[in-house]
Amino acid sequence: MSTLYGHLFPAYREYAELTDEARVDWLRRDRWISLPQAEAALCHLEDLVIYPPRGRMPCLLLFGSTGMGKTEIVSRFSKLHAPQFDIRTGLSRMPVLLVQMPPEPTEDQFYTELLTALNCVELSSLSVRSMRAEARHLLAEVETKVLVLDEIDKMLAGTPRQQRVFLNTIRFLTNDLKIPIVCAGTEEARMAVLTDPNLADRFGAFELMPWCNDHALRQLLASFSGLLPLRRPSR
């Protein structure tokens, strides 16, 4: 097999022996490809996990154009810090909480998504004030170290007032819980976040640079050609 499928990485050669249907199914599944830019972003995120609590916690904007892998990076970060059940306390620890932004940046929709990510199901009868209190309580209880908000672009669908209220909510949570917040989105969303001077001071930025014809792109293509279970080498 090593000679027959020498164009593939050794760990992936067995998949070339699968049926066509099984190989198509394999190709459709998500998988992580370790590339320098993505690994550099993960290093920035890892620094936030171990950051000690203080009055003004550092936060991060992970931004780039559509298709640059923002969601894949924050999903990978979340999986590397998956929830762990503590037998002694009977509680799950969730060091990294990944939340997708709701379609509109209203407080009730935001806290609904946040509490849903915290596995809270009884939400229909809760007021915004109650949801805020419950979110603060649960985030502290599960010992969340970093809160990640993906697709922060959806904030732009709100009115100027809704956007200001949402930015105030971010600032409130990071101040109250003393945890970093990561926002992933486009350049436009980054500029919107930075309109709040209080947030601009604490949000660092990591830009995912667009692909160009350089070593990084060739490395990406080489990775694909080595792991895709094609029985013949690409030319």
Q: Language model features by range: what are they?
A:
Residues M1-P58:
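A short, basic N-terminal segment
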Residues K79-G90, C120-E122:
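Post-Walker A helix-loop "phosphate-sensing" segment adjacent to the P-loop in P-loop NTPases
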Residues E151, C183-A189:
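A short beta-strand-to-loop transition that corresponds to the Sensor-1 phosphate-sensing loop
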